[in-house]
UniProtKB/Swiss-Prot annotation:
It comes from Nicotiana tabacum (Common tobacco). PANTHER family: EF-HAND CALCIUM-BINDING DOMAIN CONTAINING PROTEIN. This is Polcalcin Nic t 2. GO terms for molecular function: calcium ion binding. Pfam families: EF-hand_7. InterPro entries: EF-hand-dom_pair, EF_Hand_1_Ca_BS, EF_hand_dom, EF_hand_pair_protein_CML-like.
Length: 86
């Protein structure tokens, strides 16, 4: 059985997604991902591409909210750390 989503985790995911989705169109582009990650420190274009490849499971060039949720569920610790920053 899958682990239930904690209400705080859900709120954190929504807040983080909105932070990355700078133009508010409901999806995260590689540009938005890179620009937001730059606020956390140096990130290379190769690192952004790798992250896009990992999270963008349908390969349309954007991270949808559902793709982000699936990534967040698989990486709960990482998302909690990111939530502390944002």
């Amino acid at each position: 059985m899958a682990e239930a989503d904690d209400p705080q985790d859900i709120a954190d995911r929504e807040r983080i997604f909105k932070r990355f989705d700078a133009n508010g169109d409901g999806q995260i582009s590689a540009t938005e991902l890179g620009e937001t990650l730059q606020t956390l420190g140096s990130v290379t274009p190769e690192e952004v591409k790798y992250m896009m490849d990992e999270i963008d499971t349908n390969k349309d060039g954007f991270i949808s909210f559902q793709e982000f949720i699936e990534f967040a569920r698989a990486n709960r610790g990482l998302i909690r750390d990111v939530a502390k920053i944002f």
